[in-house]
Amino acid sequence: MTLSGQTMPLEARKCQSLTGRVRVPGDKSISHRALILGALAVGETRISGLLEGEDVLNTAKAMQALGAKVERRTDDNGGIAWSVRGVGTGGFATPEAPLDFGNSGTGCRLVMGAVAGCPIRAAFDGDGSLRSRPMRRILDPLELMGARVISQSDGGRLPLTLEGARDPLPIVYRTPVASAQIKSAVLLAGLSAPGVTTVIEREASRDHTELMLKHFGADIVSVAEGAHGRKISLTGQPELHGAGVTVPADPSSAAFPIVAALITEGSDIVLDDVMTNPLRTGLFVTLREMGASIEESETRLDAGEPMAQLRVKASRLRGIEVPAERAPSMIDEYLVLAVAAAFAEGTTVMRGLRELRVKESDRLEAAAAMLRAGGVAVEIAGDDLIVEGRGRVPGGGLVTTHMDHRIAMSALVMGCASDAPVKVDDIAFIATSFPDFVPMMQRLGANFA
C-alpha cells in the first residue's frame, strides 16, 4: 500500500528464461549496522553500496535525530557514498520527536540497544505491521543493564518510550532464542558499560555486529560454546573510530533471482559481490543439496565480510529435509525456499520454523497460503512446513501479501515458472528492502504486468 493508501497489484507470468548479470542491493543487515556504528564512532565513516530501501533510510533518519550528521554524496563519476559523522560512544542526544522505523524491526531493535546505553529518553514507533511485533525479548536484557521502559503498548509493543541507563551495567546474558537482534542490542548497549558484556548463544546467529564492531576498533572476542553456540565478550567504553565500509550484495535479496533462475528453464544468470558469510548462506547450502547449480568465483573480504560472484543455472531440484538448526542462517529465506520446494520433485520438509510466526507477518501460515494459491499441496505440522513438490506449479491464484515484502517477491518468483500467472495483491512494501526488484527482474527476462 502506498502513502496515498492505494494498493499496487502485479501479475507474474511464465517467462522463457532468465539471463544476464546484475548486482542486487546492498545487504540490509550490514547497512543498518554501518549507519549505527558510524553514528557511535568518532570521525567520519564512508559507506558505499548502502541499501537505499525504506528500512535503512529510516535508520539513517534516526541517527540524524540522535545527533549524528548523515549525508548522501555523489562523486564526479556518479558514484554514491554515504557519510556519517559520529558523536562517539554514549554520545547520542535526546531526539525532538519519536523515532519512526516504518516496517523495520531490525533498525528499531538495534537502535533500542544503542539508546539503552545513553543517558537519554527516546520514543520508538513504526507502521501497523511493526506495531504488532513483539519487543519484550529485546527490552528484557536492556532493563537488566539499567535501561527503563517509560511507556509501552500491550506486551512491550510499539509505540514505546525507552530511557537509557546513566551508568549501564555489563551483564552475562543467555539469549532465549537464536537472534542476532537480541545479541546485537545487548552488545550495542554494552559499548557504554564499564567492564565486559557477554552474550551466550545456544545456536549461533549471524555475526555481522561482531565483525563490524571489530572493524570500528572495539575489543570483542567470539569463541565456540557447546555444539552449535557462541560466547561473545565485549570490553565496554571503547573509542570507536570512523571507518570505510563497502556493503556487499544482500544474500537475502539475491535469493529471489537465484530461485527464479533455478526454476525457469534455460536460465543462466550472474550475481556480483554477494555476501557469503557462512552464517547467512543456509539457503545456498540447502539449494545445492536439492541439486542447484550455484557456482562461486572472485571471492574477497571487506570489513571482515566475505563476498563472491555467483553463477546460477536452471536446475532439476529434488525434495529434501532441512534441519531446524539451519534456521538461523536462512530465517529470511524460507518463503522463497518454499517456492523452490514446490518446483522440486518429491517432498521437502522444513523443520523448526517457529520464528517465522513473529516476522512482518506470520510467515509460516503465509508460506502455506502462498503455495496453495499456486495449486501446491502443503501442510503445517507444528513448527514444520511440508511441501509436496511435483516438478511444476499450476499457478493461477491471488496471493495476499499482508504488507510483507518477502511474500510479495516470493509469489512473483513463483509466477515466473508456473503454468498460469500468479497475481500479488500489493507490491508496495517491496520498497522496504529491494526497491529495484521489479525492474531488475524484468531486465533478466521476467514477465511482470
From Swiss-Prot:
What is a single Pfam family found in this protein's UniProt entry? EPSP_synthase
Q: Which cysteines does the record link by disulfide bonds?
A: none
Among Gene3D superfamilies, the record links this protein to: Enolpyruvate transferase domain
Task: From the record, give the transmembrane residue ranges.
Answer: none
Q: Please list the GO biological process terms of this entry.
A: amino acid biosynthetic process; aromatic amino acid family biosynthetic process; chorismate biosynthetic process
Q: Which sites bind phosphoenolpyruvate?
A: K28, G105, R133, Q181, R363, R406
Q: Which residues bind 3-phosphoshikimate?
A: K28, S29, R33, S179, Q181, D332, K359
What is the protein's quaternary organization? Monomer.
Under what name is this protein listed?
3-phosphoshikimate 1-carboxyvinyltransferase
